[in-house]
A protein has these predicted regions:
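Phosphate/Mg2+-binding loops and adjacent switch elements
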Residues: 121-146
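Walker A/P-loop phosphate-binding motif and the immediately C-terminal alpha-helix
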Residues: 36-74
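N-terminal, positively charged regions that mediate nucleic acid binding
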Residues: 2, 12, 51, 63, ...
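Phosphate-binding loop that captures ATP/GTP phosphates
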Residues: 66-67, 72-118, 122-123, 129
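Conserved, well-folded catalytic cores of nucleic-acid-processing
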Residues: 15, 63, 82-86, 134-142
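Extreme N-terminal, non-catalytic leader segments
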Residues: 1-44, 66
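Solvent-exposed alpha-helices and their adjacent loops that cap or buttress functional pockets
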Residues: 30-33, 89, 97-102, 139-142
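Alpha-helical scaffold segments in soluble metabolic enzymes
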Residues: 55, 59, 78-81, 130-135
């Protein structure tokens, strides 16, 4: 640490050992209990990300693990339909509660928040990113292993 250090690393250009990098990772809702996260991603649409996610969650659930699926496909959500879920997610002052499938898989998708599940969502860029982040920060995932 420099002799002139005032302890304010955000305005300092020195690379001292006291500097701790700021995490850019959004923290989940404090009431959530989440084990590990498996991301199923691709830059291309229509390659089976939702199908793989649904099958992976089902396989986890069948082996005794508790699973949840965060459907980040805001403009074309299909996870609720894959699981046959049509009821809306619920919310209170503490957060949003995901819908639960017949087999106990917790799911969160934008169409679980719409009045009509097939209403189009015409969002772009930062608004989509904000919605996905809210699914992580505002949803209360109840003791999921994956």
């Amino acid at each position: 640490m420099s002799e002139t250090c005032g302890g304010n690393c955000s305005s300092c250009s020195e690379a001292c050992s006291e500097r701790k990098p700021e995490s850019l990772q959004a923290q989940p809702n404090p009431k959530s209990k989440i084990g590990k996260v498996i991301a199923v991603v691709s830059g291309k649409g229509g390659v089976g990300k939702s199908t793989v996610s649904a099958m992976l969650a089902t396989a986890m659930q069948r082996t005794g693990r508790r699973a949840g699926v965060l459907d980040a496909d805001i403009t074309g959500p299909s996870i609720p339909k894959a699981f046959g879920v049509s009821e809306c997610a619920s919310a209170d002052e503490e957060g949003i509660y995901p819908a639960v499938t017949e087999s106990g898989i917790q799911i969160m998708s934008v169409n679980l928040l719409l009045e009509h599940e097939d209403d189009p969502v015409l969002w772009r860029g930062p608004i989509i990113a904000g919605a996905v982040e809210q699914f992580w920060t505002d949803v209360i995932w109840d003791n999921v292993d994956y």
